[in-house]
Amino acid sequence: MVKSLADEGIGIVESVDEMENGKIIIRSHGVGPSIYDAIKAKGLELADATCPHVKKAQMSAKTLADEGFKVIIIGEKNHPEVKSIKEWAGKNSLVIGSQEEAENIAFVSNWVL
């Protein structure tokens, strides 16, 4: 699949900095707000293929974090989807990847799961 896309002039970039012009397609796992800002700053065309469920989780995490809640995200911390949700929540978030990690958290009243 990647080869056939490459034959059409479509490639994978690890950073928006690799692009000077053209169109960026965001995959279904989504990305954090800094990527959207970089795309806009460079004047690149955007095709956002973020899954609607992921987008909803991102926006919910952002809203709750902006309201002062601490957001707990359950999942693998290095999974792209989890990383993107955490980036939207910012510093007011925590990723839990196992039951053991969950058992070691001291919950306070403004944490949202």
Residue ranges and their predicted role:
Residues 1-113:
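The feature marks the mature, well-folded catalytic cores of soluble enzymes
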